[in-house]
Amino acid sequence: MDKKLARIRRATRTRQKIKELGTTRLVINRTSRHIYAQIISPTGSEVLVAASSVEKVINQEFKYSGNKEAAAFVGKIIAERALKKGIIKVSFDRSGFQYHGRVQALADNAREAGLNF
């Protein structure tokens, strides 16, 4: 089993468990250059809030958007946008990525900004 397939299998298991809980989920996707975060409804049919390092606000702030500092800023922005919409409690879906580095920075700053997970 290769690395990508193993990550996808972990992500599928996590999503299934979160679906059983029936809560909104904070989904992370990571590429080598950017990081994306979305808060998805319990049914999975609509994106309630989104933020990514591709956005102009973040792109102008950082020289390179594929680092921990940019991920931390995305975490802060996603939490602020969620709180404006009245979303406080979410389940963290790291999409099979290891809880380390950019994923951890995003999660920690989202918690500091007021999201509970």
Curated annotation (Swiss-Prot):
Domain of life: Bacteria
Gene Ontology BP, a term: translation
Keywords: Ribonucleoprotein, Ribosomal protein, RNA-binding, rRNA-binding
A GO molecular-function annotation: structural constituent of ribosome
Any one Gene Ontology cellular component term annotated for this protein: cytosolic large ribosomal subunit
InterPro entries cross-referenced by the UniProt entry: Ribosomal_uL18_bac-type, Ribosomal_uL18_bac/euk
Covalent S-S links between cysteines: none
Keyword match Chloroplast: no
Quaternary context: Part of the 50S ribosomal subunit; part of the 5S rRNA/L5/L18/L25 subcomplex. Contacts the 5S and 23S rRNAs.
Function: This is one of the proteins that bind and probably mediate the attachment of the 5S RNA into the large ribosomal subunit, where it forms part of the central protuberance.
Record-stated family: Belongs to the universal ribosomal protein uL18 family.
HAMAP family assigned: Ribosomal_uL18_B
NCBIfam families: L18_bact (TIGR00060)
Protein name: Large ribosomal subunit protein uL18
Gene that produces this protein: rplR
